[in-house]
């Protein structure tokens, strides 16, 4: 979700 910016939100 965070386009890879946040490790747990790599969606």
Curated annotation (Swiss-Prot):
Record's subcellular location: Secreted
Keywords, comma-separated and alphabetical: Amidation, Neuropeptide, Secreted
GO BP annotation list: neuropeptide signaling pathway
GO cellular component, one term: extracellular region
Secreted as UniProt keyword: yes
Highest taxon of source: Eukaryota
Positions of modified residues (Asparagine amide): 11
Family: Belongs to the periviscerokinin family.
Entry function: Myoactive peptide; has excitatory actions on the hyperneural muscle.
Entry protein name: Periviscerokinin-1
Source species of the chain: Periplaneta americana
């Amino acid at each position: 979700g965070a386009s890879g910016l946040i490790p747990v939100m790599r969606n």
